[in-house]
Amino acid sequence: RTDKHIIEQICEHYKIENPDLRCEMYFSEDERRLSEQLSSQLEEDFIVIEPHSKDNYTPNRAYPFANWQKLVDKLGKNIQVVQVGLSNSPVLDHVVDFRGKTSFRSATLLIEKARLLMSTEGGLVHAATAVDTTSLVVITGYQTVKMVAYPQNINVYIGSHGPCGLKIPCLDCKRDSAKHNYEEIHEKVVDFLT
């Protein structure tokens, strides 16, 4: 179904009407203490980026790594950019490299302290809603905005088709991502940060 947000769809099954479109996570004092140690290495103002889309389910949510790099090159002149993710994923230039230094939960606590998370639709975007941090989310034609976008986020829909819902590579999703002008994202981030 693509007519409602996924949270609304799940709540509908349990007869819960008008749920808040946000997730909930709860953290221990130890988790918060470790997060403080990690974030103490950073400037007061920073943004978090996860440029890699988990592709073992579908490759069709990905946004070009080169475009993420262009964004970091421009944004990094005015604000610190911290990259999270798996230790074996490619690292962007000009970022604070926290790949492999955080779990999903500790990355969420780092995002809590950030001004913004930049990513494609995925787990960290959902987690950011639990800690009240706005995300800039790139959404491809793989899925509909209505199903995955949170109203508190900056949602950039780049699809010209769909939702395809394909788990195999979609040529339309790939083409849309390749031709998207990253400047649209840059302008939205600058507007948000100023």
Task: List each model region and its residues.
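Catalytic machinery of carbohydrate-active enzymes
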Residues: 1-194
